[in-house]
Amino acid sequence: MQEGKISQIIGPVVDVDFPEGRLPSILDALTVTRADGTKLVLETQQHLGEERVRTVAMESTDGLVRGMNVTHTGKPIQVPVGLEVLGRMLNVVGDPIDGRGPVNTKKSYSIHRLAPRFDEISTKAEMFETGIKVIDLLEPYSRGGKTGLFGGAGVGKTVLIMELINNIAKQQSGFSVFAGVGERTREGNDLWHEMMESGVIDKTALVFGQMNEPPGARQRVALTGLSIAEYFRDEEGRDVLLFIDNIFRFTQAGSEVSALLGRMPSAVGYQPTLATEMGELQDRIVSTKKGSVTSVQAIYVPADDLTDPAPATAFAHLDATTVLSRSIAELGIYPAVDPLDSTSRILDPNIVGDDHYDTAQAVKQLLQRYKDLQDIIAILGMDELSDEDKLVVSRARKVQRFLSQPFFVAEAFTGLAGKYVKLEETIKGFKEIIAGRHDNLPESAFYLVGTIEEAVEKAKTL
């Protein structure tokens, strides 16, 4: 165990002096024991000459002073992995933060691991059902694939992620890993209590590095969650779900660290290594022949600008994109998914079947035609449309409302019981609306219901 001494502290960046020729390797973990006996973990980022390293702290550097002893652990940050972490809440370095005693696992993994080799990766395309109509029909998620939830502030990314955790954990009884990256601590607290109440917690491991943490923790916490998920995939042979909320904060923390380390900023002030950092994280989220990791990542879009380098870099890695739109949220349609902007690589008749594909395309064509007619309606009004176009508008508005549905996790806000809709029910409902079988029902009958039968029943009460 090599000992060094702190020579400089600038916020979350700490410089440490070591004897010449004994410098720790880049990414190695160092530990400092504070006066109150607590340990602080530092991660080596740069070598400054022969005797000094620059490190980034994983927790607040309050209480550190120059001259304090630093111990070199000889390896990168290690986190506990195994079945014992299920039902627990950890921080970036794998310490429990739920007040329920230590996590005793037989194994620990480094947070920095190589991506699986090409010959180990599985490329099988298969849809997995979420029970959310708009997603299953128009941008189906693939098992072992990566999905991004794009949206600006307050359009419902976190609620949608929480609904997915709820549906998948209950319906498919798989293991989930949730990484809270730089988001609100209150939301993490709500999620924890909701999971405890619903009984889902026993199949979930939670890792948090929230908004109040220094940038080092926010930059690394996604890797901690990923290492836990990799253990379940590689050693337990499981199909794991990895939820990351929010991947933008990973990039944002990387940008802060980059500036603190004195690197020249790149476009829009982001770090020059943006694409590399994102690639190193995303390349590890893959399915192998042993098991799969299906990931759902919330991606905050700064100022609703999808061309910003942070969301644009993430786009390249995804199999499906769910774009949440403020204009749809303003109509009161939740989940506020934009059906024309969202995409999926597996919406292909060879994978999902002709029936599903044809229904999805018909829905998109109907909504696109309605969008094209909206300018005419705004200027001339509905009366100037042909009878055929009036019918298109009427059906499109019903489809638009039928794409909404009540969520289990939002029962407290809506006062409506949550609904899980099976894929065949979803396809059947939209086919009937497009075929004109429900032209006589009012639009409001289709709003916030599950199946088409519920819409018919609701119409009787209106």
Curated annotation (Swiss-Prot):
Q: Which InterPro entries match?
A: AAA+_ATPase, ATP-synt_VA_C, ATP_synth_F1_bsu, ATPase_a/bsu_AS, ATPase_alpha/beta_chains, ATPase_F1/V1/A1_a/bsu_N, ATPase_F1/V1/A1_a/bsu_N_sf, ATPase_F1/V1/A1_a/bsu_nucl-bd
Q: Does the keyword section mention Acetylation? A: no
User: What does the UniProt keyword field contain?
Assistant: ATP synthesis, ATP-binding, Cell inner membrane, Cell membrane, CF(1), Hydrogen ion transport, Ion transport, Membrane, Nucleotide-binding, Translocase, Transport
How does it sit in the bilayer? Peripheral membrane protein
- GO annotations of cellular component type: plasma membrane; proton-transporting ATP synthase complex
Which amino acid positions bind ATP, per UniProt? G151, G152, A153, G154, V155, G156, K157, T158
| EC id | 7.1.2.2
Give the catalysed reaction(s), semicolon-separated.
ATP + H2O + 4 H(+)(in) = ADP + phosphate + 5 H(+)(out)
What CDD domains has UniProt attached to this entry?
Answer: ATP-synt_F1_beta_C (cd18110), ATP-synt_F1_beta_N (cd18115), F1-ATPase_beta_CD (cd01133)
Name the PROSITE patterns for this protein.
ATPASE_ALPHA_BETA (PS00152)
The cross-references to SUPFAM superfamilies, in alphabetical order and at most eight, read:
C-terminal domain of alpha and beta subunits of F1 ATP synthase, N-terminal domain of alpha and beta subunits of F1 ATP synthase, P-loop containing nucleoside triphosphate hydrolases
Compartment(s): Cell inner membrane
The Swiss-Prot or TrEMBL record annotates one GO molecular function as:
ATP hydrolysis activity
The entry assigns this protein to a family as follows: Belongs to the ATPase alpha/beta chains family.
Q: Which PANTHER family match?
A: ATP SYNTHASE (PTHR15184), ATP SYNTHASE SUBUNIT BETA, MITOCHONDRIAL (PTHR15184:SF71)
Sorted alphabetically, which HAMAP family does this protein's record hold?
ATP_synth_beta_bact (MF_01347)
Protein function = Produces ATP from ADP in the presence of a proton gradient across the membrane. The catalytic sites are hosted primarily by the beta subunits.
Q: How does it assemble?
A: F-type ATPases have 2 components, CF(1) - the catalytic core - and CF(0) - the membrane proton channel. CF(1) has five subunits: alpha(3), beta(3), gamma(1), delta(1), epsilon(1). CF(0) has four main subunits: a(1), b(1), b'(1) and c(9-12).
Instruction: Please give the name of this protein.
Output: ATP synthase subunit beta
Give the species. Pelodictyon phaeoclathratiforme (strain DSM 5477 / BU-1)
